[in-house]
């Protein structure tokens, strides 16, 4: 079982010719909604590949929240531990697209209602996990409580440190793997809590160049296949979900990274954060064709 503890957002996306000036109203050319949030994105990526996935998080007791839970169930994800809250709305991301650029306002909403006490009540679900995957779009004290129980139960953890925040003192020892991008990795290694011995906990994503990690003192690079990219939005989340899935299947770190890099590469060939996330059959076909 893969347990994902993280965010669930509804993306509200508008397209205009240019960004409005303060106080100005513009007529947009397109509006659409999509399911997002790093936590849910990564859960979907793992489930599409055939993983047994449960989601832990919060949504509002509102139409967005109800719609999201229905969608996740259709993706085969267990949502019994996603808590609807009545006093706060489902998390949203307001995205304006103009001339190839974007402007984004994230309203965490219900995502910040997942508290350490909730994790304590759900520790039985954590104990059944093969691996636990987290991000930093929820409260830090909640993430810390998940790490506490994971360490107590001897369960491997993956922390995707995005959006970036410095890793608090004491966390490094509890985390199995961190999956920063290049910029996040640079900041992590300059932080006061980083030690050289933690280098082998880092699996660094390099965008279209693939990924790199260190094992037994060696730097190991995993190159990415060349693809025609349509939308890179969900590549990082696909990588994390795939990594968790293949590690839970018992693959070595190197093999799991190789599969995750290929899954992320394939995901960018279709639009949408979740739209391009491949199934296991699609990924196998893609890799065999290489």
Report residues per predicted region:
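Glycine-rich phosphate/adenosyl-contacting loop at the front of the ribokinase-like
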Residues: 1-58, 63-67, 74, 229-230, ...
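Hydrophobic anchor at the start of a short beta-strand
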Residues: 2, 53, 79-80, 157, ...
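Conserved N-terminal subdomain of the carbohydrate kinase-like
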Residues: 22-26, 33, 48-130, 284-290
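Small-residue (primarily alanine) positions within well-ordered alpha-helices
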Residues: 43, 150, 185, 256, ...
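Gly/Ala-rich phosphate-binding loop of Rossmann-like dinucleotide-binding domains
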Residues: 47-48, 151, 248
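Conserved beta-alpha-beta core of the PfkB/ribokinase-like small-molecule kinase fold
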Residues: 131-193, 209-211
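Conserved phosphate-binding/catalytic region of the ribokinase-like
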Residues: 166, 194-290
